[in-house]
Amino acid sequence: MREIIERVKEKTTIPVYERTIENVLSAIQASGDVWRIVDLSEEPLPLVVAVVTALYELGYVAFENNQVILTRKGKELVEKYGIGPRADYTCSHCQGRTVEIDAFSELLEQFKEITRDRPEPAHQFDQAYVTPETTVARVALMHSRGDLENKEVFVLGDDDLTSVALMLSGLPKRIAVLDIDERLTKFIEKAADEIGYENIEIFTFDLRKPLPDYALHKFDTFITDPPETVEAIRAFVGRGIATLKGPGCAGYFGITRRESSLDKWREIQRVLLNEFGVVITDIIRNFNEYVNWGYVEETRAWRLLPIKVKPSYNWYKSYMFRIQTLEGSKGFEDEITVGQELYDDEESSTT
């Protein structure tokens, strides 16, 4: 195992552990699909590629018919270490989200109809939207936690069009939406007119800039889906916290294992707990399921993959975090001067 770890370290600066190798070997036994291996192993895609490449170079795996398979040497390795195939027992009813959306079936159909001509994801803004079922499940989750009804809700970045589902629910007292992409803000304005929802404010805005006064300390709840760098957590989640009125308010956002190692998770959680002074109340595994975006062949993931095959299912998922403010919690109000680093780091793959 040490030989494999050392070979992986030659290929990436992402931290690698014996558990990393075990996770990838376990996933390979469950599926030869490279996207599914990333999904099941729950390691950052660039790290999975480094591990698979090292295993290939050392003779533990082979590539056949666009699949990753264990060689005889690889089978002997997993038997030696007692590594079996990764099992998946996700609830087939709620898809592991812990909320069911049957009560929102009419809202779901309305949402699908209104968003059928939505703007396609823009690669330059690291956009990728979730499935309609995920968006509606967000409404169900937020409502179940007491964070929607008669609340003022801020949406920071909305390629998922969560604001549209919120309008259809009729639950919030007021909604505000910020997004850097004018295509999205115009689409949301059009949807608001179609729905007849008036208590919404929509702005085209770059979150690297400090929020204007009209957005600070005015809201009960925020939701955002940030790029997965520590700077992006400050820009999106930190800005979200800055919109909240005070203690007892809530924020929602997604973080993946596909582009964030547990080492990065630790740094993100340090920012949340130590810099922002909030508490994490919920982390729901693979809550957010993303529709495969049309620019996959333009991404770093495609350049890295040893097997060039498009994903056949929605492989990209993120954990849903819920945070709550306490006495002394504070957001991030300074200007962020980074450029592309807002979207990219060593663990990124969808940019």
UniProtKB/Swiss-Prot annotation:
A Gene Ontology BP annotation from the UniProt entry: polyamine biosynthetic process
GO molecular function: transferase activity; transferase activity, transferring alkyl or aryl (other than methyl) groups
GO cellular component: cytoplasm
Enzymatic class: transferase
Main location: cytoplasm
Pathway it works in: Amine and polyamine biosynthesis
Compartments, record wording: Cytoplasm
Pfam families: BpsA_C
Enzyme Commission number(s): 2.5.1.128
Reported phenotype of the disruption mutant: Grows at 85 degrees Celsius with a slightly longer lag phase, but is unable to grow at 93 degrees Celsius.
Keywords attached to this entry: Cytoplasm, Polyamine biosynthesis, Transferase
Domain of life: Archaea
Catalytic activity: 2 S-adenosyl 3-(methylsulfanyl)propylamine + spermidine = N(4)-bis(aminopropyl)spermidine + 2 S-methyl-5'-thioadenosine + 2 H(+)
PANTHER family in alphabetical order: RRNA N6-ADENOSINE-METHYLTRANSFERASE METTL5
Role played: Involved in the biosynthesis of branched-chain polyamines, which support the growth of thermophiles under high-temperature conditions. Catalyzes the sequential condensation of spermidine with the aminopropyl groups of decarboxylated S-adenosylmethionines to produce N(4)-bis(aminopropyl)spermidine via N(4)-aminopropylspermidine. Can also use spermine to produce N(4)-aminopropylspermine.
Family the entry assigns: Belongs to the branched-chain polyamine synthase family.
Protein name: N(4)-bis(aminopropyl)spermidine synthase
